[in-house]
Amino acid sequence: MLTGQQRLAKTSSTPGKTQLINHFEVLGTDKKKWYLVDLPGYGYAATVSQKARNNWGNMIESYIRKRENLVSLFVLIDSRHLPQAIDIDFIRQLGEWQVPFSIIFTKTDKNKPGATIRNVETFKKTLLQEWQSLPTLFLTSAEKKEGREELLFHIRSLHETFSP
C-alpha cells in the first residue's frame, strides 16, 4: 500500500504467514536511506505450534526492545473486529516499554457502512480505560488506497524529525 508496488512484500490471505523479520530499504526524499521493517504478526498464527508462537513473541520483543534506532512502531489492527485482548495486551506492553507507536486500522473497505467507525470508537474507549491519551490513529484500505497519503505524511514527519 505505501509504495504502490504490490509485489514488494509477499502477502497471504491466511493471517500469520509472516514468520521472519523483513527489512525494506527506503530512500527518503532527502536521499537518506532508512528502513521499514515488517515483523511477524502476534495474533493469528493459529496453524503453528505454541512453541513457534512463543519463539515469534520472543523474537518480536527482543527486536522491539533492543533497537536503539527504532523511531516508531505501527500496530496494524483489522478494522473488521472489535478490540481483541491480544491487541490491547500488546499495546499495553509497548507502553510499559516506552516504545512510540501508532495504530493503523486496516481493511476499512471490507466493513459494512458504519462498522469501521463503531469498531474504532470501541477500540479508543477501551484504550482510554488505561491510557490518558491515544496514539496517532490511521484508517486505511490497501485496495482503495485510503489513508495512504496521511500515513506517508506521518512517516515523512517522523523521518525528518529523527533523521541525523
What is each PLM-predicted segment?
Residues M1-Q50, S157-P164:
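Conserved G1/Walker A P-loop phosphate-binding module
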Residues T3, E61-E68, G95, K124, ...:
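Signal for well-folded cores of large energy- and translation-related assemblies
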Residues K17, G41-G43, R80-L82, K107-K112, ...:
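Conserved nucleotide-binding/hydrolysis micro-motifs of P-loop NTPases
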Residues T18, R53-G57, K145-R148:
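Amphipathic alpha-helical transducer elements in NTP-driven molecular machines
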Residues F24, M59-I60, D87, F123:
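Generic structural signal for conserved hydrophobic packing positions in ordered secondary structure
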Residues A52-R80, R92-I104:
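Inter-motif core of Ras-like GTPase G domains
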Residues L82-Q98, T116-T126:
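Conserved catalytic-core segment of NTP-binding enzymes
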Residues K110-P164:
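Canonical P-loop GTPase G-domain recognition
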